[in-house]
Amino acid sequence: MSLARNLSHRTLAWGAVLLLWVGFVWGHSLVGGAASSAESGRVVALLRPLFEATGVTDLDLMTFIVCKCAHFSEYAVLGGIARAFWSRVSRELGSRASSSRHQVLLAGLVLTALVPCLDETIQLFVPGRSGSPRDVAIDLAGAATGALLTWLFRRARTRER
């Protein structure tokens, strides 16, 4: 509990948002295969005119693209939230020595990278679902993109001041 006492309320709020988002991601992984396919089907039906306008007419390909974009997107959000949280923790707990700050950021990176690994493991135990190393790679790419975009946004805002 002493760790939490050393963090600001704003940082703790970012931590809560991060935990809620991880819960959302893992909760989504607990949805059975049939329900997950139905959800993807609804999105495909909505986007079908856009797919067809770009020359994509294969329904399986549309579904594949929607599913992989969903993976990427939910992890881009996770990456952005995680970057905000771990950067704040690093600033608040890390000493002035950059090695301490880097250790905090490295711990955050490792913990964030474990989320998609556990996500795909969860899916191994859900009827109609499967875990995939390819999905872990897509998830990690999404998280990295989200972290990069939020870092760039913060950097641009800091330069404006």
What are these regions (language model features)?
Residues 1-125, 133, 140-161:
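Bulky hydrophobic segments
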